[in-house]
Amino acid sequence: MHLHYKPNGCLFILQNAIDCARLTGQSIYTIEVFRPVRNIWNRAQEWARAAITPAGLGWMSKYIYQYHRLMLMNLSPREPATHNWPLYNYPPPHILVGYQKLLQICNDYIFDVRAYSRLKYSEQINFGSQLMNWSVMANCSYTINTGAYHRFIDMDNFSDTLTSIQQAILAEKIVADLALIRPMRGFGRTNLDADHDVPVEYLLQEQSKDIGACQERAWGLADRIRVQNAGRKDLVILTTIRKLKTAYFNFFLVKHLPLAPEQELSLPCDCFWLDAFIQKFAESDQAAEIDEALRLQQVPTQTLTKCIISALSLPNCAGTALRGGAFTLRPREGNRAVTESMRRARGEMIEQFVDRLPMRRRRRREVPQPQVAAEEYPSEPEELSFESEVRTAVAETIRLLEEELTVSARNQQFFNFAVNFYEVIQRLEALGDINETTLQRWVMYFFVAEHIATTLNYLNHQIRVSSPFGRYVMLNLAQVVMRARNEDGQIVYSRARNENGNTVLVTSCLALALTWLPQLREQGEEIRAGRDEQFMAEIAYHDNSGDVSEILKQVAVNDADIDSMEISFRFRVTGPVVFSGLREIQNINRRVIRAATLFRQERRPLPALNERVQLPPAQE
């Protein structure tokens, strides 16, 4: 069995019934009976003319077979869906490969509304190739409650407690980003016997749409979804990476906290110090004290943002040098600085650290042997070089761990927006422009950004990365529409971003949110004069994509008016149509077409599915 498809110029071959069954939701037996044929070049005479042209197939699909519904049923011979009109105990003459899987992908997510429209067919004819493709537009949306801030924003005497509220918000977000609170592992048993089913997973997903109901669970949504979908090996790696970032964050934060004096950690501990580093700053009682100090708002906001940006940007460059503490450096050993000893043993230490994790390594990387220089190393401040060495070692460890992740878990471009949000709040703090409006906006758009990133990551993995769906079904267009509404249900603003790829789309959407954050204003205040053209450039405004004055008016609306936000994800996909190579199915299809033609000529409605209809006799 060979199903040929050219989604992007390359020849793809579906070589077995298993892939076809997975993409159609049918059994292998059904596919074997169906005998799928993809390329009908020089074989077109085997099928009725109406069955092999886009117009004819569109008519049959809409009025006779109703493929938009039929493809979701069990089409195995003699199953209830195949009784009488129009199948007569056999599968249909066509199967839309990937259509059922697409609907399953959308159905398995937390969307409130799912709609599928514009099911169309197109033909590709080249020398030696005659193919038919289907395409459909999917529109899936859900609404998140952004107005229920509860303890996040809605507090009395806001102006008197602005600093404490800002620090509380930052502390809660940082706690979620670095998992300083041990997350609940699993949901336990999610359904009970008989009529007492309790949809726990559904209830938890619904709760994540309400920033007030989920409370502290509002933060860290993207990473929670990522961890929940990870396999055992990926879970070990992601947990270790999180511990490394947490330890690194606490290492720099500890000197700013009024904690009780603790015995300082002596390094380099024979230069194999990573395990002690994690135990000290991510797993010990001192880590819990740091967590409590964060909640008690004992750390300056600027320090918090610098530390979290440095930690979350790992393994990339931080951009800001930080000073840490809680380590006692040993004196120079053998006329060599301790940090130089750490640098020389870094590669071997990292390899041994990864090897000790409870997982099977994908490959063994050769440890480069550093060149030994005879001259004395220049005398530089040991504290600074030591802290640089700590970051370099942690960054290289995280980079090596990320290489061990599977492709889906390694795909992180959707989750890199947090650093940008922290940089915005850091910049506003430095300018002294923190007020109720900006804090409210920061919380809301961070919450919205996590939802957009999480959903786009899910769709990207299922539609573009997952095999075999990503090989045979092509994503043509992706669009995100954000509609903010007030308590009366009226639209406060509506913006759409559309691109030809999900990766670019998420960058575009988050850039839009980040651009709106610094627009400081009171309720009803317009964007400052001279800033309108700059703002339109920052949000990548395209000509004829909306009235400029209306967009500026929408931006000037106070975010306190926004009670909910509807997020719609629209995408168009194209997949292959396969024809049945079974002669009996082809003959039944010819008789069904003749019967439908007679019904139309007599101005009678076409029969309903499974209705008893006597077909015309077969023609010789």
From Swiss-Prot:
A single GO BP: DNA replication
Highest taxon in the source lineage: Viruses
Any one GO molecular-function label of the UniProt entry: double-stranded DNA binding
Keyword DNA-binding: yes
Any one GO cellular component localisation term in the record: host cell nuclear matrix
UniProt entry tagged with the keyword Protein biosynthesis: no
Site entry: Cleavage: 187-188, 325-326
Pfam families, per the entry: Adeno_terminal
Modification note: Preterminal protein is used to replicate viral genome, upon genomic encapsidation it is processed first into iTP and finally into TP by adenovirus protease.
Localization of this protein: Host nucleus matrix
Motif (Nuclear localization signal): 356-365
Marked site positions, Priming of strand displacement replication by covalently linking the first nucleotide of the new DNA chain: 545
Keywords associated with the record: Covalent protein-DNA linkage, DNA replication, DNA-binding, Host nucleus, Phosphoprotein, Viral DNA replication
Residue numbers of O-(5'-phospho-DNA)-serine PTMs: 545
Family: Belongs to the adenoviridae terminal protein family.
Function as written in the Swiss-Prot or TrEMBL entry: Protein covalently bound to the viral DNA that acts as a primer for viral genomic replication by DNA strand displacement. Assembles on the viral origin of replication in an initiation complex with viral polymerase, DBP, host NFIA and host POU2F1/OCT1. During initiation, the polymerase covalently couples the first dCTP with Ser-580 of pTP. The terminal protein stimulates the template activity over 20 fold compared to protein-free templates. Neo-synthesized viral genomes are linked to two preterminal proteins, one for each 5' end.
Subunit structure: Heterodimer with the polymerase; this heterodimer binds to bp 9 to 18 of the genome. Interacts with host POU2F1; POU2F1 binds to the auxiliary sequences in the inverted terminal repeats and tethers the pTP-POL heterodimer to the origin DNA thereby participating in the assembly of the pre-initiation complex (POL-TP-DBP-NFIA-POU2F1).
Protein name: Preterminal protein
Species the sequence originates in: Bovine adenovirus 2 (BAdV-2)
Gene: PTP
